Amino acid sequence: MSLLSKFKNDPLFAKVMRSSGSLFSNNTLALGLSVVQGIMATRLLGPAGFGLIGVVMAFASTVNSIFSFRMSELVVRYGGEYLNKQDKEQASALFKAASTTEAAVSLLAFLVVLFTAQFAEIYLAKTPDIAWMFTFFAINLLANFNIETSTGVLQITEKIKLQGAVNLIQAIVTTLIIAGAFFFGGSIIVILVAYLIGRSILGLGLFILAQNQLKEKLGSGWWRTPLSKLTARKEIFRFAFSSNISATIIKLFRESELIWVGFFLDTTAVGYYRVAYTITHFLAIPADPLIATTFPEINKLAVEKAWGKLKSFLKKITAFSFAYNIAIGAGLILFGQWVIQIYSGKEYLAAYPALVALTIGLVFNYILFWNRPLLLALGLPEFPVYVTLAAGIIKLALSFWLVPVYGVAAAGGLLSFYYIASVGMMVLRGIVEIKRKEER
């Protein structure tokens, strides 16, 4: 049997590809619109203005992640198991706990942004009289009060493709507003409003879709189920706490790059880095649908203790992701300067060294995109915490020395180091654990 036949005849791989393909098609259209948004916003605002918007948006997201419990992972891990066992009572209690906790965290995050906006203005944006922007954009945290739980529900009910439809709608609305600002001389405020409306549409849209799925699967009164019906409260709390710590570490060391660049340099440098970061994250477009659709399948195989099938599945999705990530990565490195000029103009060519550095680490990360979901499915939620913390501390320590001297290229290189070190260790740990369980 040929390699291609093995892929085509694997029903699990085919199922994941179908679900990912549906989500990918909508996300591809949304990506095209986000490119158009970037083309207009970079030219309208210039590097400093584009960087300022990036810092404002990243600050709200980072504060939220510090308190976030990554409810989508908890919902997939335990909600998926309960639904598979037709244990609707425990599933209802879990979804209720996840929803209320996430809503409380979103409110807390908004209040933290409100009280720290002045600090962000002085030390991160380094631009006078813009503290209100941080508070204004943080309204999206309230609109996204249940986005993680909703995403998890759509994953385990196999309706994740609907996320792509909502994402496309918000991309269309955001693009139309930015286009109006671009052609009619709008200000940075209009751009900020556009992104706020887009984020709000995504959060509220997913919430409505998830509620419909919960009513269909559990009945209209699912939310009345008392939390006391959860029997594995200690285990669930351990998972949620570990996910919270892991999410905080990941956000501080990996996904808050614009904030750190703003802290070490200025908003112009943030503008350059944001362009490089945005372009290289085109790699995430095919990867994100795969992550969303493979985690539930990995979790199912782990629950069933089907270790042979799990290894075969991981090999297939890794081979698939290797092929397209290497191709896209090589294209970004070879034609990166040309891509930057098309996306944002010659004014942003200083972003190219950072683009090259970031591409290397992101290609490695997205080839092995299943690293953390595998450990969660294997019951090892703490291991990613230790690894990401160690790699993150080293990265941050080196940043104080290298970024002020070598600029955005050093920032990109250090993030790549973080990806390679942390992802590599998590993959090795997952493989070792599968072998250990097979030998039992």
PLM features: what roles do these ranges have?
Residues 14-77, 110-117, 140, 238-268, ...:
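Signature of the first transmembrane helix
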